[in-house]
């Protein structure tokens, strides 16, 4: 099961239960979070909400809201998203060596999660997806690709040639579009609230959450 961007503490109520239902209904045996498990709105390089939570308050709430995810799916890979790495970027901007920075799993109270840039399962690569759409990335890398990042996109699309076939798939996300941290996207298309099941690297199912 591949779970979309959470952006905790701004994840949509009910998304965890939905993901659990999909995991059980397809008898899944592996979990991959596609990245941006936290939002880090307070430390954004863009304008932040003046009435929003301060840094420690947002972090503590994000940790609190990640705990049920970690309790439910303790063995998981997490591809590191642009929002996840925001604090690391701020540290680099301040010339702070990485030796001083905690690992993601330690800072977020998720000790058994594996945070990584890329996961490959059944010859399918899972990445967060800042570099473009899944349909273009799979062609660029000549490898089936599943990614997140683009909240409004949810699809699977095959590219078939004379000697090979690959697919690109967008997972969708689990964000609460009405949260203040998502105000920047108020005039964007609605987010696709969904997760994705990939079976043996060949069958891809986009599961949309009933809303």
Which ranges hold each PLM region?
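Acidic carboxylate-rich catalytic motifs and surrounding loops in phosphoryl-/glycosyl-chemistry enzymes
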Residues: 78-83, 114-117, 206-210
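A generic structural signal for alpha->beta connector loops
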Residues: 73-75, 110, 123, 165
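Short acidic low-complexity segments
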Residues: 105-121, 130-133
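Short, conserved catalytic or adaptor-binding loops enriched in Gly and charged residues
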Residues: 104-108, 159-162
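Core catalytic region of metal-dependent phosphoesterases/phosphodiesterases
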Residues: 3-107
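Conserved beta-sheet core of the metallophosphoesterase superfamily
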Residues: 120-207
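Short hydrophobic beta-strand that contains or immediately precedes a catalytic carboxylate
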Residues: 2-4, 146-147
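General small-molecule cofactor/ligand-binding pocket signal
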Residues: 77, 111-116, 127, 169
């Amino acid at each position: 099961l591949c779970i979309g961007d959470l952006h905790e503490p701004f994840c949509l109520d009910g998304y965890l239960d939905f993901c659990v239902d999909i995991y059980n209904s397809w008898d899944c045996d592996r979990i991959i979070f596609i990245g941006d498990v936290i939002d880090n709105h307070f430390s954004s390089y863009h304008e932040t909400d003046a009435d929003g939570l301060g840094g420690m308050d947002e972090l503590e709430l994000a940790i609190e809201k990640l705990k049920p995810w970690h309790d439910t799916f303790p063995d998981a890979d997490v591809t590191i998203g642009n929002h996840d790495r925001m604090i690391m970027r701020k540290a680099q901007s301040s010339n702070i060596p990485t030796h001083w920075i905690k690992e993601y799993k330690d800072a977020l109270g998720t000790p058994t999660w594996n945070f990584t840039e890329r996961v490959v399962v059944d010859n399918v690569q899972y990445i967060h997806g800042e570099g473009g759409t899944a349909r273009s990335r799979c062609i660029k890398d000549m490898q089936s690709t599943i990614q997140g990042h683009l909240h409004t996109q949810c699809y699977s699309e095959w590219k078939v040639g004379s000697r090979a076939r690959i697919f690109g798939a967008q997972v969708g996300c689990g964000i609460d579009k009405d949260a203040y941290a998502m105000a920047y996207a108020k005039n964007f298309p609605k987010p696709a609230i969904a997760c994705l099941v990939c079976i043996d690297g060949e069958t891809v199912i986009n599961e949309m959450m009933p809303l």
